[in-house]
Amino acid sequence: MSNTLDRSESAAETHSVDLEQGFLDKIESETKIEPKDWMPDAYRKTLIRQIAQHAHSEVVGMQPEGNWITRAPTLHRKIGLLAKVQDECGHGLYLYSAAETLGTSREELVTALHEGRMK
């Protein structure tokens, strides 16, 4: 029985090594890696963290400009500020969507930000 388990564990380890080598080969050859492709867990987590940080900075970055909308001296200036705020918000939403394709939810990312687990 243990011999069967040993072979099974060995096959799983070999498969894992093959997957990792295939991943590294793709990186070396500069082949595009899609979100559903296999990648090491640490790589996926780091990628999600980086994308989430960028998304958070886009969303948080629109807030100071938003405060100036009511203080803008002309309608033309208000329109410019509104466009900038909308642009920042859109960038944040695109980035949250990119993180979602990697297997996390927008709610998880925002909750982590609010709880101080992510910056």
Go through each PLM region and give its residues.
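Non-heme di-metal
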Residues: 2-119
